[in-house]
Amino acid sequence: MKEIIGIGNALVDALYLIENEDIIKEFGLEKGGMHLIGENIFEQVCERMRAAKRERTTGGSACNTVLALAQLGAPVGLIGKINDDENGRFFEDSFRQAGVRTFLMKDAQPTGTASTFITPDGQRTFVTYLGAAALLQASEVASQWLDGYSYIYIEGYLVQSHDLIEAVVEAAKARGVKVCVDLASYNIVAAERDFFARLLRKTDIVFANEEEARAFTGLEP
């Protein structure tokens, strides 16, 4: 079986079943929307929800893909960045227990967390703090980590760091590792279309849904 290594935002998902919309209104959130927040608001959310019951899982696009492949028995690895905090240890332990070979850098910023507030009507409101995940640098990724792998899976959400993606692709090409890119989301593709156009010229396999393909090509299916 071909070996696959993924690189992406290492996140922990925290799901909360809430009885009303108080916290959504308190933080000025759009119900049903996705919101990126900074450390200050993240700390306030954590304090506000400290006593609430939550369901915690690992998250992140590439991370979810790698974990699913591991559960199917594929030999896989994962590159990302976390903090040595409770969420970071939970994240790392979860992947190691699944048999994933991890290359996880550590940062002083808290481990990235995606909080989901689910109201009684089933609507989900997302609040994401990228934290340490967004601080992975090209200089921290050792090219030899790719040795022995046939494919590298790169999530489009890493587009905040062009240098990181370009360095990883260059290292992969030098080692004969095939490059797989997930376009992540149509709005990210639209905002970074020129970069994706350059990236896909060096990509062997592209994962995109209908909306992402439309955003990239400008064409209807």
Where would I find each of the regions flagged by the language model?
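Glycine-rich phosphate/adenosyl-contacting loop at the front of the ribokinase-like
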Residues: 1-77
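Ribokinase/PfkB-type carbohydrate-kinase core domain
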Residues: 1-31, 54, 83, 89-107, ...
